[in-house]
Curated annotation (Swiss-Prot):
Its main location: cytoplasm. Its EC number is 4.2.3.4. This is 3-dehydroquinate synthase. Its cofactor is Co(2+); Zn(2+); NAD(+). Pathway: Metabolic intermediate biosynthesis; chorismate biosynthesis; chorismate from D-erythrose 4-phosphate and phosphoenolpyruvate: step 2/7. Pfam families: DHQ_synthase, DHQS_C. It comes from Burkholderia vietnamiensis (strain G4 / LMG 22486) (Burkholderia cepacia (strain R1808)). GO terms for biological process: amino acid biosynthetic process; aromatic amino acid family biosynthetic process; chorismate biosynthetic process. Keywords: Amino-acid biosynthesis, Aromatic amino acid biosynthesis, Cobalt, Cytoplasm, Lyase, Metal-binding, NAD, Nucleotide-binding, Zinc. NAD(+) binds at residues 71-76, 105-109, 129-130, 142, 151. It catalyses: 7-phospho-2-dehydro-3-deoxy-D-arabino-heptonate = 3-dehydroquinate + phosphate. PANTHER family: 3-DEHYDROQUINATE SYNTHASE (PTHR43622), 3-DEHYDROQUINATE SYNTHASE, CHLOROPLASTIC (PTHR43622:SF7).
Length: 359
């Protein structure tokens, strides 16, 4: 097992990475101080890993309940969030009740938001079961739900007590979900660590094959990078925004098609292709680097062309982006691998990128 620490002073927490971790009682015990625990999971994950987690919690002598939600991005909304609150109130959960998010990014985001809101804040633990949630969404305290007009527009910054990333859970992950997670690994290397990007290029086929040692390194390095960014800029006042490379275009794709039509990582992968093209058009990134970026995204079996929503629709959707100011869209742009710029772009350049990268 490898442990990466997120250094946030008295709110610091560990990220445990390895195989077989869901069943290890000692990873959960230090972070559960009340008399009850509520596991929040979904209809896909609970049959796979719910019993193992409940067995790990049994020696602690806590009252354990489970809220099982429908699976999918389409359910990341107020109605589903209320199912968590219904479960907590039915069980008479109190301020010391610990929530455990067992699932992918949707479960983690909603459980964290529920934890931030219930009784104005209760502790929670992330147990991410997808690659995307292990390398990205479970770390950093971003929680929330979608709105029909924009992704993740309603939420809170609320840090977990711990993250338990069990690599063994990736064995049951569908290929599309694996590729979606690799997209976030690629993003992390592209924005923050050129050497890590080189490693991803050399190992993308091994990632596709789910080789355990390669997966462990991908999760470890991605978490190290994200932890350092979050420690420096917890609430996205500046530096942390670089983690949204590919997300401005990607969120527009998700909202434009309807949440769940494309996986989040698929939209981010395609969004990176778009952002790379825009970076070249603005004279920031060289063409050879853009081609390398596109090639590794394609090798990860991710889409490299966006849906033809129309230029006006893309622009409207991107103006709802959280980075936008007074209606001006800000993009995360690449200067070279490991070096980014956050800036607006002329509409003509964005239109040209959309014309080239959508079908």
């Amino acid at each position: 097992m490898i442990t990466v620490n997120v250094d946030l002073g008295d709110r610091a927490y560990p990220i445990h990475i390895g195989a077989g971790l869901i069943g290890r009682t000692e990873l959960f015990a230090p972070h559960i101080n009340g008399s009850s625990v509520t596991i929040v999971t979904n209809t896909t994950v609970d049959p796979l890993y719910g019993d193992a987690l409940r067995a790990a919690l049994a020696p602690l002598g806590k009252r354990v309940s489970t809220v099982v939600l429908p699976d999918g991005e389409a359910y990341k909304n107020w109605e589903t969030l209320n199912l968590i609150f219904d479960g907590l109130l039915t069980e008479r959960a109190d301020r010391k009740t610990t929530l455990i998010a067992l699932g992918g990014g949707v479960i983690g985001d909603m459980t964290g938001f529920a934890a931030a809101c219930y009784m104005r804040g209760v502790p929670f633990i992330q147990v991410p079961t997808t690659l995307l949630s292990q390398v990205d969404s479970s770390v950093g305290g971003k929680t929330g739900i979608n709105h029909p007009l924009g992704k993740n527009m309603i939420g809170a910054f609320y840090q977990p007590q711990a993250v338990v990333a069990d690599i063994g859970a990736l064995a049951t992950l569908p290929d599309r979900e694996l590729a979606a997670g690799i997209a976030e690994v690629i993003k992390t290397g592209a924005i923050a660590d050129a050497e890590f990007f080189d490693w991803i290029e050399a190992n993308v086929d091994a990632l596709n094959r789910r080789e355990p040692a390669v997966l462990v390194h991908a999760v470890k390095r991605s978490c190290e990078i994200k932890a350092s960014v979050v420690a420096a800029d917890e609430r996205e006042g500046g530096l942390r925004a670089i983690l949204n490379f590919g997300h401005t275009f990607g969120h527009a794709i998700e909202a434009g098609l309807g949440y769940g039509e494309w996986l989040h990582g698929e939209a981010v992968g395609c969004g990176m292709v778009m952002a790379g093209d825009l970076s070249v058009r603005l004279g920031l990134l060289d063409e050879a680097s853009r081609q390398r970026l596109d090639a590794v995204i394609a090798a990860a079996r991710l889409p490299v062309s966006g849906p033809a929503l129309g230029e006006a629709r893309y622009m409207d959707l991107m103006r709802v982006d959280k980075k936008a100011e007074a209606g001006a869209i800000k993009f995360i742009l690449l200067k070279r691998f490991g070096d980014t710029l956050i800036a607006p772009a002329p509409d003509e350049a964005v239109f040209a990128t959309l014309a080239k990268t959508t079908r």
